[in-house]
Regions:
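Beta/alpha (TIM)-barrel catalytic core signal, keyed to glycine-rich beta->alpha loops juxtaposed to Asp/Glu
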Residues: 1-137
Length: 137
């Protein structure tokens, strides 16, 4: 950790952080107390779970606890990058809105503590769908 502090102090890096796919809640809580990492990358979606696309491993979390932890992180100036944003499946906020991944992404980024999101897209049509959602915010 001293290495990263030194690199940041000397201007070599502006920020440092970490990402984790599982068993990360305690890491985020500890970081909220110690304020060492500037940025965290965390699985976050409407379902509170995901299946890893390569390993097939299932992961879930206590959504209320995670939102509380991320709310605290955001209030302390820690950058929160959401990943696995579409891995909870299609989402619709109401019966009159067609379920889809763009709506799932909207659900994620409407949380004020989310600084940015890693969004998986496989083609230009999906890029256009996501841009449309982002432009409507």
């Amino acid at each position: 950790m001293k290495f990263f502090d030194g690199m940041k102090s000397s201007g070599v890096i502006r920020a440092h952080g970490f990402s984790a796919h599982n068993d990360y809640m305690n890491l985020h809580e500890r970081n909220n107390n110690e304020l060492f990492y500037d940025v965290i990358m965390v699985p976050f979606n409407h379902k509170g779970s995901f299946v890893h696309s390569v390993t097939g491993r299932y992961s879930e979390w206590d959504q209320d606890r995670l939102i509380s932890v991320l709310t605290e992180a955001g209030s302390k100036g820690i950058g929160v990058i959401a990943m696995k944003t579409c891995s909870g499946g299609k989402y619709s906020p109401s019966p009159d809105v067609e379920p889809g991944c763009p709506e799932a992404v909207r659900w994620v980024i409407l949380h004020y503590f989310v600084s940015s999101a890693a969004i998986a897209m496989a083609n230009f049509e999906q890029v256009d769908e996501h841009i449309s959602i982002l432009n409507s915010l």
